[in-house]
Regions:
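Helix-to-loop junctions at the C-terminal end of transmembrane segments
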Residues: 63-76, 184, 290-310
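Glycine-rich segments within core transmembrane alpha-helices of 12-TM secondary carriers
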Residues: 60, 159-184, 202-203, 380-395
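Intracellular juxtamembrane helix-capping segments at the cytosolic ends
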Residues: 140-154, 354-369
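Juxtamembrane intracellular "pre-TM" segments in multi-pass secondary transporters
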Residues: 1-10, 219-245
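C-terminal ends and interior cores of transmembrane alpha-helices
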Residues: 85-121, 313-334
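Extracytoplasmic gate region of multi-pass secondary transporters
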Residues: 27-36, 176, 240-281
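Symmetry-related core transmembrane helices of the 12-TM Major Facilitator Superfamily/SLC fold
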Residues: 128, 193-212, 419-442
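Loop-to-transmembrane helix entry
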Residues: 44-58, 125, 160-163, 268-289, ...
Length: 455
Protein backbone atom coordinates (compact mmCIF):
# COMPACT_ATOMS: atom_id res chain seq x y z
CA UNK A 1 0.00 0.00 0.00
CA UNK A 2 1.47 3.33 -1.07
CA UNK A 3 1.91 5.99 1.60
CA UNK A 4 0.11 9.23 0.78
CA UNK A 5 2.26 12.34 0.72
CA UNK A 6 1.66 14.67 3.63
CA UNK A 7 1.01 18.42 3.53
CA UNK A 8 1.99 18.75 7.19
CA UNK A 9 5.25 20.64 7.51
CA UNK A 10 6.92 22.14 10.59
CA UNK A 11 6.78 25.91 11.04
CA UNK A 12 10.50 26.23 10.24
CA UNK A 13 9.86 24.76 6.79
CA UNK A 14 7.25 27.39 5.94
CA UNK A 15 9.38 30.23 7.28
CA UNK A 16 12.46 29.03 5.38
CA UNK A 17 10.56 28.88 2.10
CA UNK A 18 9.03 32.31 2.67
CA UNK A 19 12.38 33.97 3.28
CA UNK A 20 13.84 32.06 0.31
CA UNK A 21 11.26 33.81 -1.87
CA UNK A 22 12.34 37.20 -0.48
CA UNK A 23 16.04 36.41 -0.98
CA UNK A 24 15.61 35.18 -4.57
CA UNK A 25 13.54 38.27 -5.46
CA UNK A 26 16.32 40.44 -4.03
CA UNK A 27 19.09 38.58 -5.83
CA UNK A 28 17.55 38.27 -9.29
CA UNK A 29 16.20 41.82 -9.23
CA UNK A 30 19.78 43.01 -8.81
CA UNK A 31 21.57 40.39 -10.87
CA UNK A 32 19.57 40.78 -14.09
CA UNK A 33 20.71 44.43 -14.09
CA UNK A 34 24.12 44.06 -12.42
CA UNK A 35 26.26 44.80 -15.48
CA UNK A 36 24.04 47.82 -16.24
CA UNK A 37 24.44 49.03 -12.65
CA UNK A 38 28.22 48.59 -12.72
CA UNK A 39 28.56 50.46 -16.03
CA UNK A 40 25.78 53.06 -15.95
CA UNK A 41 25.87 53.87 -12.22
CA UNK A 42 29.40 53.06 -11.04
CA UNK A 43 31.25 53.84 -14.28
CA UNK A 44 33.01 50.58 -15.12
CA UNK A 45 33.69 49.65 -18.73
CA UNK A 46 32.19 46.52 -20.28
CA UNK A 47 35.15 44.26 -19.49
CA UNK A 48 35.56 45.47 -15.90
CA UNK A 49 31.82 45.24 -15.20
CA UNK A 50 31.65 41.74 -16.67
CA UNK A 51 34.68 40.53 -14.71
CA UNK A 52 33.29 41.86 -11.41
CA UNK A 53 29.83 40.39 -12.06
CA UNK A 54 31.34 37.07 -13.12
CA UNK A 55 33.50 36.68 -10.01
CA UNK A 56 30.52 37.80 -7.89
CA UNK A 57 28.32 35.00 -9.22
CA UNK A 58 31.17 32.46 -9.28
CA UNK A 59 31.85 32.89 -5.57
CA UNK A 60 28.14 32.49 -4.83
CA UNK A 61 28.43 29.01 -6.35
CA UNK A 62 31.75 28.13 -4.70
CA UNK A 63 31.52 29.38 -1.10
CA UNK A 64 28.16 27.87 0.05
CA UNK A 65 29.68 24.44 0.67
CA UNK A 66 32.16 26.01 3.11
CA UNK A 67 29.54 28.36 4.61
CA UNK A 68 27.35 25.32 5.20
CA UNK A 69 30.05 23.74 7.35
CA UNK A 70 30.15 26.85 9.56
CA UNK A 71 26.34 27.06 9.65
CA UNK A 72 26.21 23.48 10.94
CA UNK A 73 28.43 24.51 13.84
CA UNK A 74 26.60 27.68 14.95
CA UNK A 75 23.06 26.56 14.14
CA UNK A 76 20.61 27.43 11.37
CA UNK A 77 18.79 30.28 13.15
CA UNK A 78 21.98 32.22 13.89
CA UNK A 79 23.22 31.50 10.37
CA UNK A 80 20.05 32.84 8.75
CA UNK A 81 20.07 35.97 10.88
CA UNK A 82 23.72 36.58 9.99
CA UNK A 83 22.98 35.92 6.32
CA UNK A 84 20.07 38.35 6.05
CA UNK A 85 21.95 41.00 8.03
CA UNK A 86 24.91 40.76 5.63
CA UNK A 87 22.60 40.81 2.61
CA UNK A 88 20.70 43.87 3.85
CA UNK A 89 23.96 45.73 4.49
CA UNK A 90 25.34 44.68 1.10
CA UNK A 91 22.29 45.61 -0.98
CA UNK A 92 21.80 48.76 1.06
CA UNK A 93 25.44 49.67 0.48
CA UNK A 94 24.99 49.34 -3.27
CA UNK A 95 21.99 51.67 -3.01
CA UNK A 96 23.64 54.27 -0.76
CA UNK A 97 27.04 54.38 -2.50
CA UNK A 98 25.80 56.40 -5.52
CA UNK A 99 24.58 59.12 -3.12
CA UNK A 100 28.12 59.56 -1.78
CA UNK A 101 29.61 59.47 -5.28
CA UNK A 102 27.18 62.17 -6.43
CA UNK A 103 27.79 64.35 -3.36
CA UNK A 104 31.53 64.11 -4.08
CA UNK A 105 30.89 65.69 -7.48
CA UNK A 106 31.99 62.59 -9.41
CA UNK A 107 28.68 61.90 -11.15
CA UNK A 108 25.12 63.17 -11.66
CA UNK A 109 22.25 60.69 -11.78
CA UNK A 110 18.92 61.00 -13.54
CA UNK A 111 17.32 59.59 -16.68
CA UNK A 112 20.85 59.57 -18.10
CA UNK A 113 24.02 59.38 -16.02
CA UNK A 114 26.52 62.22 -16.42
CA UNK A 115 29.99 61.14 -15.30
CA UNK A 116 32.12 64.03 -14.02
CA UNK A 117 35.23 62.20 -12.88
CA UNK A 118 33.98 58.85 -11.56
CA UNK A 119 35.19 56.81 -14.53
CA UNK A 120 38.81 57.70 -13.78
CA UNK A 121 38.40 57.65 -9.99
CA UNK A 122 39.28 54.77 -7.67
CA UNK A 123 36.15 55.67 -5.68
CA UNK A 124 34.10 53.36 -7.89
CA UNK A 125 35.83 50.35 -6.31
CA UNK A 126 33.96 51.16 -3.09
CA UNK A 127 31.18 48.99 -4.52
CA UNK A 128 33.28 45.85 -3.98
CA UNK A 129 32.93 45.62 -0.16
CA UNK A 130 29.14 45.81 -0.54
CA UNK A 131 29.22 43.01 -3.10
CA UNK A 132 31.44 40.91 -0.80
CA UNK A 133 28.81 41.23 1.94
CA UNK A 134 26.19 39.92 -0.51
CA UNK A 135 28.45 37.00 -1.45
CA UNK A 136 28.95 36.03 2.19
CA UNK A 137 25.27 36.41 3.08
CA UNK A 138 24.11 34.60 -0.04
CA UNK A 139 26.47 31.70 0.65
CA UNK A 140 24.85 31.07 4.02
CA UNK A 141 21.36 31.30 2.50
CA UNK A 142 22.07 28.65 -0.14
CA UNK A 143 23.34 26.12 2.38
CA UNK A 144 20.97 26.80 5.29
CA UNK A 145 17.68 26.96 3.36
CA UNK A 146 18.34 23.71 1.49
CA UNK A 147 19.53 22.18 4.76
CA UNK A 148 16.32 23.27 6.47
CA UNK A 149 14.18 21.73 3.73
CA UNK A 150 16.11 18.46 4.05
CA UNK A 151 15.92 18.31 7.85
CA UNK A 152 12.36 19.57 8.30
CA UNK A 153 10.80 17.05 5.89
CA UNK A 154 10.22 13.32 6.20
CA UNK A 155 10.01 10.43 3.76
CA UNK A 156 6.27 10.99 3.47
CA UNK A 157 6.51 14.64 2.41
CA UNK A 158 10.08 15.19 1.16
CA UNK A 159 9.22 15.18 -2.56
CA UNK A 160 6.40 17.65 -2.00
CA UNK A 161 8.65 19.72 0.26
CA UNK A 162 11.30 20.13 -2.44
CA UNK A 163 8.59 20.88 -4.99
CA UNK A 164 7.37 23.75 -2.80
CA UNK A 165 10.95 24.93 -2.30
CA UNK A 166 11.69 25.12 -6.04
CA UNK A 167 8.35 26.82 -6.65
CA UNK A 168 9.31 29.53 -4.14
CA UNK A 169 12.72 29.93 -5.81
CA UNK A 170 11.07 30.50 -9.19
CA UNK A 171 8.36 32.82 -7.86
CA UNK A 172 11.05 34.90 -6.16
CA UNK A 173 13.25 34.99 -9.25
CA UNK A 174 10.31 35.91 -11.50
CA UNK A 175 9.05 38.71 -9.23
CA UNK A 176 12.54 40.14 -8.69
CA UNK A 177 13.22 40.44 -12.41
CA UNK A 178 9.75 41.86 -13.05
CA UNK A 179 10.33 44.92 -10.81
CA UNK A 180 13.29 46.16 -12.90
CA UNK A 181 11.31 47.41 -15.92
CA UNK A 182 8.89 49.76 -14.09
CA UNK A 183 11.78 51.26 -12.11
CA UNK A 184 13.79 51.90 -15.28
CA UNK A 185 10.76 53.30 -17.12
CA UNK A 186 9.92 55.68 -14.28
CA UNK A 187 13.44 56.83 -13.41
CA UNK A 188 15.81 55.90 -16.25
CA UNK A 189 19.30 54.99 -15.09
CA UNK A 190 18.47 56.19 -11.58
CA UNK A 191 16.03 53.30 -11.36
CA UNK A 192 19.03 50.95 -11.34
CA UNK A 193 19.98 52.43 -7.96
CA UNK A 194 16.51 51.82 -6.54
CA UNK A 195 16.73 48.15 -7.50
CA UNK A 196 19.37 47.86 -4.76
CA UNK A 197 16.99 49.48 -2.26
CA UNK A 198 14.27 47.03 -3.34
CA UNK A 199 16.67 44.14 -2.73
CA UNK A 200 17.68 45.56 0.67
CA UNK A 201 14.01 45.87 1.64
CA UNK A 202 13.36 42.24 0.66
CA UNK A 203 16.27 40.91 2.70
CA UNK A 204 15.45 43.13 5.69
CA UNK A 205 11.94 41.70 5.59
CA UNK A 206 13.54 38.25 5.55
CA UNK A 207 15.63 39.20 8.60
CA UNK A 208 12.51 40.25 10.53
CA UNK A 209 10.68 37.05 9.61
CA UNK A 210 13.62 34.90 10.76
CA UNK A 211 14.01 36.87 13.99
CA UNK A 212 10.37 36.61 15.01
CA UNK A 213 9.26 33.32 13.47
CA UNK A 214 12.13 30.94 12.67
CA UNK A 215 12.83 28.20 15.15
CA UNK A 216 14.06 24.84 13.94
CA UNK A 217 15.41 21.65 15.35
CA UNK A 218 18.90 21.88 16.84
CA UNK A 219 21.34 21.33 14.00
CA UNK A 220 24.54 22.80 15.40
CA UNK A 221 27.55 20.53 15.47
CA UNK A 222 26.31 18.47 12.52
CA UNK A 223 27.71 18.24 9.02
CA UNK A 224 31.17 17.96 7.50
CA UNK A 225 34.26 19.77 8.67
CA UNK A 226 36.14 22.28 6.52
CA UNK A 227 38.99 19.75 6.26
CA UNK A 228 36.62 17.08 4.88
CA UNK A 229 35.26 19.55 2.33
CA UNK A 230 38.75 20.64 1.23
CA UNK A 231 39.80 16.99 0.94
CA UNK A 232 36.80 16.34 -1.32
CA UNK A 233 37.68 19.36 -3.48
CA UNK A 234 41.28 18.16 -3.89
CA UNK A 235 40.11 14.66 -4.81
CA UNK A 236 37.70 16.05 -7.42
CA UNK A 237 40.50 18.15 -8.95
CA UNK A 238 42.63 14.99 -9.16
CA UNK A 239 39.77 12.95 -10.67
CA UNK A 240 40.41 13.30 -14.40
CA UNK A 241 37.00 11.89 -15.37
CA UNK A 242 35.07 14.40 -13.24
CA UNK A 243 37.20 17.37 -14.24
CA UNK A 244 36.65 16.67 -17.95
CA UNK A 245 32.88 16.37 -17.39
CA UNK A 246 32.83 19.65 -15.44
CA UNK A 247 34.77 21.43 -18.21
CA UNK A 248 32.39 20.13 -20.91
CA UNK A 249 29.27 21.23 -19.01
CA UNK A 250 30.98 24.57 -18.36
CA UNK A 251 30.54 25.27 -22.08
CA UNK A 252 26.77 24.95 -21.78
CA UNK A 253 26.58 27.25 -18.77
CA UNK A 254 28.86 29.83 -20.37
CA UNK A 255 26.17 30.28 -23.03
CA UNK A 256 23.34 30.15 -20.48
CA UNK A 257 24.93 32.90 -18.37
CA UNK A 258 24.80 35.31 -21.31
CA UNK A 259 21.19 35.99 -20.31
CA UNK A 260 22.72 38.07 -17.51
CA UNK A 261 26.15 38.92 -18.94
CA UNK A 262 25.47 40.01 -22.53
CA UNK A 263 21.74 40.16 -23.15
CA UNK A 264 20.74 43.28 -21.12
CA UNK A 265 23.37 45.58 -22.66
CA UNK A 266 23.05 44.02 -26.14
CA UNK A 267 19.27 44.48 -26.26
CA UNK A 268 19.24 48.02 -24.84
CA UNK A 269 22.00 49.17 -27.21
CA UNK A 270 20.46 47.66 -30.35
CA UNK A 271 16.70 47.70 -29.64
CA UNK A 272 16.66 50.93 -27.62
CA UNK A 273 15.94 51.96 -24.05
CA UNK A 274 12.31 50.90 -24.41
CA UNK A 275 13.34 47.24 -24.51
CA UNK A 276 12.67 45.08 -21.44
CA UNK A 277 15.60 42.68 -20.91
CA UNK A 278 14.51 41.82 -17.37
CA UNK A 279 11.12 40.66 -18.66
CA UNK A 280 12.70 38.75 -21.56
CA UNK A 281 14.82 36.85 -19.03
CA UNK A 282 11.63 35.63 -17.34
CA UNK A 283 10.83 33.62 -20.47
CA UNK A 284 13.52 31.13 -19.36
CA UNK A 285 11.90 29.97 -16.08
CA UNK A 286 8.48 30.09 -17.75
CA UNK A 287 9.58 27.66 -20.47
CA UNK A 288 11.30 25.44 -17.91
CA UNK A 289 8.15 25.30 -15.78
CA UNK A 290 5.94 24.49 -18.78
CA UNK A 291 8.16 21.83 -20.40
CA UNK A 292 10.29 20.14 -17.72
CA UNK A 293 7.57 17.62 -16.85
CA UNK A 294 7.02 16.68 -20.49
CA UNK A 295 10.75 16.41 -21.21
CA UNK A 296 11.35 14.33 -18.08
CA UNK A 297 8.59 11.96 -19.18
CA UNK A 298 10.00 11.75 -22.73
CA UNK A 299 13.52 11.05 -21.48
CA UNK A 300 12.61 8.65 -18.66
CA UNK A 301 13.82 5.57 -20.57
CA UNK A 302 16.89 7.32 -21.95
CA UNK A 303 20.25 7.63 -20.24
CA UNK A 304 21.28 10.84 -18.52
CA UNK A 305 24.05 11.24 -21.10
CA UNK A 306 21.57 11.00 -24.01
CA UNK A 307 19.25 13.59 -22.46
CA UNK A 308 22.13 15.97 -21.74
CA UNK A 309 23.46 15.59 -25.30
CA UNK A 310 20.07 16.54 -26.77
CA UNK A 311 20.07 19.68 -24.64
CA UNK A 312 23.63 20.54 -25.64
CA UNK A 313 22.69 20.49 -29.34
CA UNK A 314 19.70 22.79 -28.71
CA UNK A 315 21.99 25.49 -27.27
CA UNK A 316 23.70 26.50 -30.55
CA UNK A 317 20.23 26.87 -32.09
CA UNK A 318 19.30 29.31 -29.32
CA UNK A 319 22.45 31.38 -29.95
CA UNK A 320 21.71 31.48 -33.70
CA UNK A 321 18.24 32.87 -32.99
CA UNK A 322 19.81 35.54 -30.79
CA UNK A 323 22.21 36.49 -33.58
CA UNK A 324 19.52 36.64 -36.27
CA UNK A 325 17.69 39.62 -34.78
CA UNK A 326 20.38 42.08 -35.87
CA UNK A 327 20.02 40.89 -39.48
CA UNK A 328 16.27 41.58 -39.66
CA UNK A 329 14.79 45.00 -40.39
CA UNK A 330 11.04 45.01 -39.72
CA UNK A 331 9.36 44.75 -36.32
CA UNK A 332 7.86 41.37 -35.43
CA UNK A 333 4.54 41.35 -33.55
CA UNK A 334 5.20 44.93 -32.51
CA UNK A 335 8.65 44.15 -31.11
CA UNK A 336 12.07 45.23 -32.37
CA UNK A 337 13.56 42.23 -34.26
CA UNK A 338 16.55 42.09 -31.90
CA UNK A 339 14.22 41.90 -28.90
CA UNK A 340 11.86 39.38 -30.51
CA UNK A 341 14.59 36.98 -31.63
CA UNK A 342 16.26 37.33 -28.23
CA UNK A 343 13.04 36.10 -26.60
CA UNK A 344 12.96 33.13 -29.01
CA UNK A 345 16.59 32.34 -28.20
CA UNK A 346 15.97 32.54 -24.45
CA UNK A 347 12.98 30.20 -24.85
CA UNK A 348 15.21 27.64 -26.60
CA UNK A 349 17.79 28.04 -23.81
CA UNK A 350 15.12 27.21 -21.25
CA UNK A 351 14.06 24.19 -23.30
CA UNK A 352 17.67 22.99 -23.51
CA UNK A 353 18.01 23.38 -19.75
CA UNK A 354 15.13 20.93 -19.15
CA UNK A 355 17.16 18.21 -20.88
CA UNK A 356 20.38 18.96 -18.99
CA UNK A 357 19.87 20.28 -15.47
CA UNK A 358 17.61 17.51 -14.07
CA UNK A 359 19.99 14.80 -15.32
CA UNK A 360 23.40 16.35 -14.64
CA UNK A 361 23.48 15.50 -10.92
CA UNK A 362 22.49 11.94 -11.76
CA UNK A 363 25.29 11.61 -14.32
CA UNK A 364 27.81 13.41 -12.09
CA UNK A 365 27.12 11.02 -9.22
CA UNK A 366 27.68 8.04 -11.54
CA UNK A 367 31.17 9.35 -12.35
CA UNK A 368 32.01 9.70 -8.62
CA UNK A 369 33.78 6.93 -6.67
CA UNK A 370 31.37 4.39 -5.19
CA UNK A 371 30.29 5.27 -1.68
CA UNK A 372 31.47 8.89 -1.95
CA UNK A 373 28.75 10.31 -4.20
CA UNK A 374 27.31 12.56 -1.49
CA UNK A 375 30.65 14.17 -0.67
CA UNK A 376 31.41 14.80 -4.34
CA UNK A 377 27.95 16.21 -5.09
CA UNK A 378 28.80 19.11 -2.78
CA UNK A 379 31.00 20.40 -5.60
CA UNK A 380 28.73 19.46 -8.49
CA UNK A 381 28.30 23.19 -9.29
CA UNK A 382 31.98 23.77 -10.03
CA UNK A 383 30.90 24.18 -13.66
CA UNK A 384 28.87 27.25 -12.67
CA UNK A 385 31.87 28.67 -10.82
CA UNK A 386 34.04 28.32 -13.94
CA UNK A 387 31.38 29.36 -16.45
CA UNK A 388 30.54 32.50 -14.47
CA UNK A 389 34.14 33.70 -14.61
CA UNK A 390 34.91 32.71 -18.20
CA UNK A 391 31.44 33.47 -19.59
CA UNK A 392 31.17 36.96 -18.11
CA UNK A 393 34.73 38.01 -18.98
CA UNK A 394 34.22 36.75 -22.53
CA UNK A 395 30.99 38.74 -22.67
CA UNK A 396 32.78 41.95 -21.68
CA UNK A 397 35.47 41.45 -24.30
CA UNK A 398 32.95 40.68 -27.06
CA UNK A 399 30.66 43.59 -26.15
CA UNK A 400 33.58 46.01 -26.22
CA UNK A 401 34.65 44.70 -29.61
CA UNK A 402 31.33 44.24 -31.44
CA UNK A 403 28.68 46.21 -29.50
CA UNK A 404 30.51 48.96 -27.57
CA UNK A 405 28.97 51.42 -25.14
CA UNK A 406 27.28 54.25 -27.15
CA UNK A 407 28.51 56.89 -24.67
CA UNK A 408 32.06 56.29 -25.95
CA UNK A 409 31.07 57.80 -29.34
CA UNK A 410 30.32 61.39 -30.26
CA UNK A 411 27.43 60.56 -32.59
CA UNK A 412 24.86 57.79 -32.95
CA UNK A 413 26.07 57.23 -36.50
CA UNK A 414 29.64 56.60 -35.33
CA UNK A 415 28.38 54.07 -32.80
CA UNK A 416 26.12 52.37 -35.39
CA UNK A 417 29.13 51.88 -37.66
CA UNK A 418 31.10 50.32 -34.80
CA UNK A 419 28.19 48.01 -33.88
CA UNK A 420 27.34 46.83 -37.41
CA UNK A 421 28.46 43.29 -36.61
CA UNK A 422 27.14 43.16 -33.05
CA UNK A 423 25.49 39.80 -33.74
CA UNK A 424 28.92 38.21 -34.20
CA UNK A 425 28.96 37.95 -30.39
CA UNK A 426 26.49 35.08 -30.57
CA UNK A 427 28.51 33.18 -33.19
CA UNK A 428 31.23 32.69 -30.57
CA UNK A 429 28.68 31.09 -28.28
CA UNK A 430 27.35 28.94 -31.12
CA UNK A 431 30.89 27.61 -31.47
CA UNK A 432 31.33 27.01 -27.74
CA UNK A 433 28.04 25.14 -27.42
CA UNK A 434 28.75 22.98 -30.50
CA UNK A 435 32.22 22.07 -29.24
CA UNK A 436 30.73 21.18 -25.84
CA UNK A 437 28.01 19.02 -27.43
CA UNK A 438 30.49 17.05 -29.55
CA UNK A 439 32.87 16.75 -26.59
CA UNK A 440 30.08 15.27 -24.46
CA UNK A 441 29.43 12.56 -27.07
CA UNK A 442 33.14 11.70 -27.22
CA UNK A 443 33.33 11.73 -23.42
CA UNK A 444 30.42 9.29 -23.15
CA UNK A 445 31.98 6.85 -25.62
CA UNK A 446 35.42 6.99 -23.98
CA UNK A 447 34.02 6.55 -20.45
CA UNK A 448 31.87 3.62 -21.61
CA UNK A 449 34.88 1.93 -23.19
CA UNK A 450 36.99 2.43 -20.05
CA UNK A 451 34.23 1.01 -17.84
CA UNK A 452 33.83 -2.02 -20.13
CA UNK A 453 37.56 -2.76 -19.91
CA UNK A 454 37.51 -2.49 -16.12
CA UNK A 455 34.45 -4.74 -15.69
Amino acid sequence: MMRKESWNFPRAFGVANTVELFERAAYYGLFIAITLYLSRIIGFGDIEAAAIAGVFQALLYFIPTFAGAYADKIGFRKSLMLAFLLLTLGYGGMGILPTFLESAGLVKYGEVTEFTGLIDSSAKYAVLPAMILIILGGSFIKSVITGTVAKETTKSNRARGYSIFYMMVNIGAFSGKTIVKPLREAMGNEGLIWISYFSAAMTFLGLLVVFFMYKSKEHSGEGKSIKEILDALVRICLNFRLIILILIITGFWMVQHQMYATMPKYVLRLAGEGASPSWYANVNPLVVALTVGLVTQMMRKRTALFSMTVGMFIMPVSALFMASGNMLQADILGMHPVAFMMVIGIAFQGFAETFISPRFLEFFSLQSPKGEEGLYLGFSHLHSFLSSIFGFIMSGVLLERFCPDPRLFETREAWAAAATNAHYIWYYFVGISLISAVALIIYGKVVKRIDEKQS
